Amino acid sequence: MQKRALTINSRGLNGELAVPGDKSISHRALMIGALSEGTTVIDHFLVGEDCLSTLRALQDLGVEIERKGEHVEVIGRGIAGLVEPAAPLQMNNSGTSTRLLMGILAGQSFTSQLVGDASLSRRPMKRVQGPLARLGAQIGLSEAGTLPATVVGHPLQGARVKLEVASAQIKSAVILAALQAQGSTTVSEPLPTRDHTERLLKAFGANLTVDRAANSITVTPGARLVGQEVLVPGDPSSAAFFLVAGAVIANSHLTVKDVCLNPTRTGLIRVLKKMGARLSIKETASGGEPLGDVTIQTSQLRAVTVTAKDVPDLIDELPLVALLAACADGVSEISGAGELRVKETDRIQTVAELFLQLGVDVEERPDGWRIVGRPNWQVQKPNLNSHGDHRLGMLAAVAALRSTTPLFLIDPDAVAVSYPSFFADLAKLGGA
């Protein structure tokens, strides 16, 4: 397996960059464009492996899609216009593709099957199957409740669906299924999650009512979706690696431009401010999705406590919060993050293992970590492993910048899932 030497940096990270398009929005723009009438034009599309899995699956479902770099044109087939695929739909490693497509396919007029790679095939899918069944969806899973999934498309009925897990993927699957149902559907969640699906559907013409006080969305089917132009903002989950690096690497001062500032995605920024980071934001646009430039510089950080109520807005960034804690003054505790155990890897375990290799004082807990911050670490093992997890690989690369010991990353290509140009962009700022 490939191994990459990681950079040790004492000069600091300086300059500015724009990160790739947001992964969540790229997925959803493709899918909603496919269900619309007319042409949807997507710019700054994320050309990562997960989003390409969605693109290829939609093509297999009869959708005409043309991509030139980050520019994508989708010729919609309407809400009921998808066609039966000739073979199982390959999801590769993409949980978002899988769960959202389960919702879309549940109301179509044919049977389809979703399959994935070894990692995705271990991830739980009953959590989607159950809520969709409330609308009458017929979805078969393995005995373990995992892929392959067989979706028997047929007419759906509106329902009231109360989600037990705060998950934007599950919520979105129900909303996309509800577009095809007879009668309205109301889906409620225990805590607010990212709302890109709702924002995009409203822009395309769907009839959605959002009740923020009740954390619920009501979908009234029958509205005609019409193709739109979508400019995908920079992915805050990708920007997060540079914001954290800028805070913890000495002599750093950097700006990440045109980042999505959707309030459901700015949890890391709030944590950085709470920890005392020297950070500023210049909002540059506001419309379907607010965006702006975020500037950060080397900061003296204090310990932080993160609990379950904080988790939905920074679920993908929690490993980076753990890294901030490892560099801060004092003892930090992160809890309520059990959802990390069913990501591409068990991220609670793999982050703890990575930190122990680096010499970080970390205690793994069932739903998070207890971390004692230290100014310097004593590396125990130099070979760090991404375990095929894109976010773990990038976390290791950022952590390595603080090391005085040469470090190596096993399976660095995993970062291509969400950020193919990560190492090149790190080099632009001096991290090479």
UniProtKB/Swiss-Prot annotation:
Protein name per UniProt? 3-phosphoshikimate 1-carboxyvinyltransferase
Q: Where is the active site?
A: D316
Q: Which GO MF terms does the UniProt record name? A: 3-phosphoshikimate 1-carboxyvinyltransferase activity
HAMAP family xref list: EPSP_synth
Q: What is the lineage of its organism?
A: Bacteria, Bacillati, Bacillota, Bacilli, Lactobacillales
| Residues annotated as binding 3-phosphoshikimate | K23, S24, R28, S167, Q169, D316, K343
Any GO CC annotation of this UniProt entry: cytoplasm
The record's catalysed reaction(s) read:
3-phosphoshikimate + phosphoenolpyruvate = 5-O-(1-carboxyvinyl)-3-phosphoshikimate + phosphate
Enzyme nomenclature, EC number: 2.5.1.19
